[in-house]
Amino acid sequence: PTLARIVLIEAPDPSLNSLVGAIKLANAMGPGAVSMSFGATEGSWTGSVDSAFGGTNMSYLAATGDNGTEVSWPAVSPKVLAVGGTTLTYSGTGSRTEVAWSGTGGGVSAYTATPSYQTSAVPGMGSPLRRTVGDVAFNADPSSGQYTAVMTPGSSTVNWISAGGTSLSTPQWAGLVAVSNAMRVQLGKTLLGQPHPMLYGQIATVAGTYASTFKDITSGTHGTCGACTAKTGFDQLTGLGTPNAGSLLTSL
């Protein structure tokens, strides 16, 4: 079998042209999953660059941000899986609790129309005014995040810190997509590509499948607005919820 590849692509600067250029470079190196941990406040311009997310058999994932209620690009693109964050509390006995992280981004776009997959058939969705993010979530709170080795420039001392943010939850979801692609290839299927139609249309709208593949996050807040509190079914903080990876992978 072909070994997995992780390729780091760095844009020369944070300008829109450079970021779009980096995405197009990933397309040229594809197929695969593109994990994006950058974001800019959405605007009327966002639709003009959506064509960058048109690579064949490519899955695009982006962080929703770490500043509470907000809508940013590229997460707001209908072709991008917007990944929010949770706070995970766990013990050595295997028990855990999970709530929406207070820093997770998310909200209703002021510019992007409601995509076809965000329908009233999705539990908790209602009738969205426009594109609503996030789509899904994963552990992102730095206090419950991933221990990471860091070395200060000029120092030879390695320290361990607990890293977090939706820049942590997004690559975790990208890893799931990569595993799903490997499983699909073994089964003679095409790569997953844009995951939204399957996650929303074939999983979230089927009660038993949704319950087995996602943990629905029903508590936690990231602001003071009416939609800023997690609830049963879809919400802007955690989307459909966090994955039950084993079950989700067999459903993808």
Say what each PLM segment does:
Residues 1-252:
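Subtilisin-like serine protease catalytic core
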